[in-house]
Amino acid sequence: MMREKNREHYKKRRDKSGVKKDGRMQMKNNNKGSVSIYIILIFAVLLSFILLIVEGARKNAIRLKTECAMDLSMSSALGEYNRELLEQYELFFIDTSYGKKQASIDHTAEHIKGYLTDNFEASDQMSKDLLGLVAEQVLITDYSLASDENGALLKKQAVDYMKDLYGVSYAKEFKKQLDEVNEKGLFTLDVSAIQGASQSEIDSYPLPKKKVTDKDGDHWEDVRLDNPADAVNATRGIISLVLPAETEISTAAINPSNYLSGRNCNTGSGLAGRTALKSTDEPVFNEYILKKSGNYAFPKDNSELKYEMEYILHGKSSDIDNLKATITQLLFLREASNYIFLCASPQRCSEAEILADSVSLAALSPELKEPIKQTILCAWAYAESVYDVRKLLEGGKIPLMKDDESWHYSLDSMFGYATDAMEEDLSAGAGMDYTDYLRLYLMLKDSEIKTKRFMNVVEMDVRRTTGNSYFRLDCCVDSIEAEALISSTYGANYTISRSIAYSE
């Protein structure tokens, strides 16, 4: 009995001991499960945070690369300036025809898009593109053209170039020459009109008659007035007398409707807030035109018109007509200058007066002494002017106002001026050359007219070069503003806008 009780007691204790052991094991397993869930939750939060950081970094990288790529693409677009325009005229403009027949600003947009695509490509083919950027579309939202505001942007680049090259002080000297011309009235003093008025007075005067006896008996005849100045004055307007011997005149001609001033031009936004040129910049632009354009005395190689400066001044369609108009202008100015000198020279006035006195007395009309004297002075001034212009055309120099030393013809020798040969050294002496005289007239020319004609000349000469047959200045861009739509294969779209220009 005692043994059975002990066994039962022992069994109960063993059962109780087993229960406690199983409980501890169960609690231990529950603790392990709680830790695992906690770690998973922490890892999920950390992973989300890491992914958020990675995505933020990706967005920043996309933004940075987009901005850099856009800036590079815009600069690359400006790098496609027309090479001939730079080489011949030192001007930076994008020719939106890109050597093709049809020009369009859309071509520039496509070029920018192409540069964006190149900039977005991975530099290493083995590397993974973590940004996935694609240039979906590029639009040009604003642009300025060379022809805008009557060539304001072309003039601005030209003036900046000249200021960098020479400064601005040199242009002031030319202004002094123009002031002297205006002060003395060389642009307005019409010697031909003086000669015409004097000749009309002579022609309207009733010459006396004289009694003549011959084999038929006595009869009355009109007294003849033999004025030696008539032979010189009769040659006025004969341009061939001015041209140097054996001169070959250019026969080149253009169709004005083929160039900028003869068509309706495309328009852009112009200066668009950029600093406009001042009135003091106009002489600088004149010097640019003179530097980049040829003329009769100093021609430019490979030009459509051989006498470009003459065309800019007169706008006629042929070299011959422009040269004639220029020679007429130069004769007018030189004749005025020479007439003023003769009238101010006591010695030469006295010579003309003595000759006029003898002519009028021979005609029994002493009242005509003064008008005859004026015709002699006008003829003398004209003969000297023909010599002057002939020398200028051959590359020589003539002072604006002559003195005794620089005066060429005596009263006797001026009657043979038409057959006079240019034998002296053209490089000798001081004064102004042919281009200097053209400068005077260029300074007087209306700014809009001369700018348009110069732009015509630019188009003429650039079109002569390979790949520029359809070149047009109103299709040449100085500044652009572009907007690009960028997408990412990771699900984001971006829009970026940039502007860039050659001139500020």
Can you name each region flagged by the protein language model?
Residues R3-S104:
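Alpha-helical assembly-interface signal, strongest on the long, hydrophobic N-terminal helix that forms
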Residues M1-M2, I376:
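Short intrinsically disordered, low-complexity coil segments enriched in acidic
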